[in-house]
């Protein structure tokens, strides 16, 4: 059970980080 929670936490963190990087690159291209 604990491993499943940690796995989903890691997956959510990775998706959030990717989204932040994607938005950051788009803002750099807009400037």
From Swiss-Prot:
GO CC, any one term: cytochrome b6f complex
Predominant place of localization: plastid
GO MF term list: electron transporter, transferring electrons within cytochrome b6/f complex of photosystem II activity
One biological process term in Gene Ontology: photosynthesis
Bilayer topology annotation: Single-pass membrane protein
Coiled coil ranges: none
Entry's localization field: Plastid, Chloroplast thylakoid membrane
Keyword Plastid: yes
Stretches that traverse the bilayer: 4-24
InterPro entries: Cyt_b6/f_cplx_su6 (IPR007802)
One Pfam match: PetL
Superkingdom, natural source: Eukaryota
Keyword entries, A-Z: Chloroplast, Electron transport, Membrane, Photosynthesis, Plastid, Thylakoid, Transmembrane, Transmembrane helix, Transport
PANTHER family (UniProt xref): CYTOCHROME B6-F COMPLEX SUBUNIT 6
Purpose of the protein: Component of the cytochrome b6-f complex, which mediates electron transfer between photosystem II (PSII) and photosystem I (PSI), cyclic electron flow around PSI, and state transitions. PetL is important for photoautotrophic growth as well as for electron transfer efficiency and stability of the cytochrome b6-f complex.
Subunit structure: The 4 large subunits of the cytochrome b6-f complex are cytochrome b6, subunit IV (17 kDa polypeptide, PetD), cytochrome f and the Rieske protein, while the 4 small subunits are PetG, PetL, PetM and PetN. The complex functions as a dimer.
Family: Belongs to the PetL family.
UniProt name for this protein: Cytochrome b6-f complex subunit 6
Native species: Physcomitrium patens
Phylogenetic placement of the source organism: Eukaryota, Viridiplantae, Streptophyta, Embryophyta, Bryophyta
């Amino acid at each position: 059970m604990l491993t499943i929670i940690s796995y989903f936490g890691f997956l959510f963190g990775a998706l959030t980080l990717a989204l932040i990087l994607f938005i950051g690159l788009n803002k750099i291209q807009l400037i």
